[in-house]
Amino acid sequence: MEELLWLTDLASIESWIENRVECSYPAAVIALIDYGSGNLRSVEKALRYVGAKVQIVTRPDELHDAHGVVLPGVGAFDDCVNSLRRQELFGACREFIGTGRPFLGICVGYQALFEKSEEFNSCAAGLGIFPGRVVRFSTQTGLKVPQIGWNQLEVVKPDCPFFQGIPSGSYVYFVHSYFPQPVNPAIVATRTTYGETFASAIWHDSVYATQFHPEKSQKVGLQLLKNFVNLVL
């Protein structure tokens, strides 16, 4: 895991990013959706570091000219999807995905791509891009919930462009109690085991999504975000 384990807080991770030389790729306009509870600051910094031109958006019309979209995630499933509805971004996200331009969901932004969640007996419907529901880790495993910290990826779709240069066994950073259960196993790009094995990332067409936080996952995470920017260019 090289230098990963000693960087466990957000401030250290942001400092780690800032102390490296920024990439000089042509700017790609990536819309970073602000729905009021996403982890915007660290995601924005990491995207800028790997060469993206980032536009923080709060309105549906701001997605029109974006080359790619990132839906970040911190907080609850209901808060995310209800905020997207209030800001008229719910339908806008669905429409954007329909255009075939790259879309990245992170953590709750990943969960929101599915139909529903059992979190807090949620009644809110997700974006419904993929069939499936979001479930809580079992209490039978004896492990602490939420999962907070580094864990390994098993890359099951090595041809996925988002995971280029990322071997199985790579460590990434998780903070979550819930995870999606896709109905279609063909969309699963990586798996991770924390008492039970779950889909830690998915890929279908131009949609990529991760339960872990690339912006907190240092070298591996930056490579993933760089791969996403390259898809957007």
What positions do the PLM features span?
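Acyltransferase
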Residues: 206, 210-233
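Short acidic low-complexity segments
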Residues: 54-65
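Pocket-forming structural segment of enzyme catalytic cores
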Residues: 115-194
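Cysteine-nucleophile active-site neighborhood
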Residues: 75-148
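N-terminal beta1-alpha1 ligand-phosphate binding loop
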Residues: 30-50, 215
